[in-house]
């Protein structure tokens, strides 16, 4: 995708862009996917801010790296999509809007490795940040449900933290979408 954008930028700068070809279609699809992904993240965050404003704090917070020395050059920013907090409980949600919520290798469906590594890293760094306080930190990968036959809906206990992977069905009436989001908050925060 980066090469595609670079190539299009080059053609535009050089004045060589003349047609609405497959390249333009791919670019528009890419931009639409990026917008939809951001919209999905923002929808979930704003839903929790509005519907649980007096019960849960909802933000898109940065999580500081918990380093053993002061060397932090070249480390990426850990920017959560959604971080929900209530008292001593924290739920970090990484919202994923993909065409395929699972990867398939050798006819076996598995979670996207990079997504799992990302949420695990967020959770463990937040856990360590709060080590001096009584707390519980959990993570969730929340995929927009696709039309695939197999989709994730699992809860894992990893190194002392709960990591949940589930889907949000956006093809339902809004009241049922809201019920799905409410259930996440109610179960996690015992509301």
What are these regions (language model features)?
Residues 1-31:
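Residue(s) in the substrate-gating loop at a strand-loop-helix junction
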Residues 33-191:
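Catalytic core segments in nucleotide and nucleic-acid processing enzymes
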């Amino acid at each position: 995708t980066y090469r595609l954008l670079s190539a299009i930028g080059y053609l535009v700068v050089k004045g060589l862009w003349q047609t609405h070809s497959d390249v333009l279609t791919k670019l528009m699809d890419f931009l639409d996917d990026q917008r939809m992904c951001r919209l999905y993240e923002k929808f979930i965050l704003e839903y929790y801010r509005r519907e649980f404003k007096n019960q849960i704090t909802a933000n898109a917070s940065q999580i500081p790296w918990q380093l053993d020395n002061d060397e932090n050059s070249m480390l990426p920013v850990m920017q959560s999509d959604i971080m929900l907090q209530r008292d001593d409980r924290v739920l970090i949600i990484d919202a994923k809007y993909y065409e395929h919520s699972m990867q398939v290798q050798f006819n076996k469906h598995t979670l996207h490795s990079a997504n799992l590594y990302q949420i695990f890293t967020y959770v463990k760094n937040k856990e360590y940040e709060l080590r001096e306080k009584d707390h519980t930190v959990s993570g969730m990968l929340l995929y927009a449900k696709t039309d695939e036959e197999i989709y994730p809906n699992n809860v894992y206990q990893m190194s002392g933290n709960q990591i949940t992977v589930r889907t949000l069905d956006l093809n339902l009436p809004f009241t049922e979408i809201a019920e799905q989001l409410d259930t996440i908050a109610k179960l996690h925060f015992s509301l």
